[in-house]
Regions:
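Short, small-residue-biased leader/transition segments that mark boundaries at the very start
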Residues: 2-7
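Alpha-helical scaffolding segments of alpha/beta enzyme cores, especially the outer helices
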Residues: 9-13, 37-41, 72-83
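Alpha-helix capping and helix-loop boundary segments enriched in small/acidic/polar residues
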Residues: 12, 25-33, 61-72, 78
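Short acidic catalytic loops
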Residues: 1, 19-20, 45-62
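Aromatic-lined carbohydrate-recognition surfaces of secreted/lumenal glycan-active proteins
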Residues: 16-31, 78-99
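Glycan-recognition surfaces
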Residues: 86-168
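Short, acidic/polar
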Residues: 30-44
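Short, hinge-like loop/turn segments at secondary-structure boundaries
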Residues: 37-38, 68-69, 105-109
Length: 168
């Protein structure tokens, strides 16, 4: 059928299941309007997990990612996904509160600075060593590896810094 099917077959031949990505681009109400169709599409096409993204200022009112309005949305999306037996890995979502114990289909939240921050802000070398003892107390974490070029000036000539890491 399509290129996605080619990738799914290749992954399946190696014992790997594909995860669908739903990037909302911060248009949360629009995403909510389409959740049933999106989740049904996933079920119909053999996807049982989704990584949902919320990059940007939340539309329509500029809500905060960690505010009550968005917390209500995250819970709504996780409950709706449970109805379809879909696992959720929420990216740019709120820090975990323990709802993964009530909704075990919530398999992870990012809610931590991954190495994608190295490109523009940098993380301290010890940052990732602290996460299991700080961030992961609240629940499972999605850590985004994001950057593999350690010399930032190769991506941005004005940035002469190097990724602070033990990777040479």
């Amino acid at each position: 059928r399509g290129l996605g099917d080619v990738y799914k077959r290749q992954a399946a031949s190696k014992g790997i299941k594909m995860m669908m990505h739903h990037e909302t681009s911060a248009s949360v109400r629009n995403y909510e309007r389409h959740l049933d169709k999106a989740y049904q599409f996933m079920v119909d096409n053999g996807y049982n997990s989704v990584k949902s993204g919320y990059v940007g200022n939340i539309i329509p009112r500029g809500e905060h990612h960690y505010g009550q309005w968005m917390n209500n949305h995250y819970l709504y999306a996780v409950k709706k996904a449970a109805d379809y037996k879909i696992m959720v890995n929420a990216h740019e979502a709120t820090r975990p509160t323990g709802i993964c114990r009530t909704y075990p289909n919530l398999i992870g939240n990012e809610s931590a600075r991954g190495t994608e921050y190295e490109a523009f802000a940098g993380n301290k070398p010890f940052h990732t060593t602290l996460l299991p003892f700080t961030r992961q107390i609240g629940g499972p974490m999605d850590y985004t590896p994001g950057i593999f070029e350690t010399h930032c000036n190769k991506m941005n000539p004005a940035n002469n810094s190097q990724v602070r890491s033990t990777i040479a």
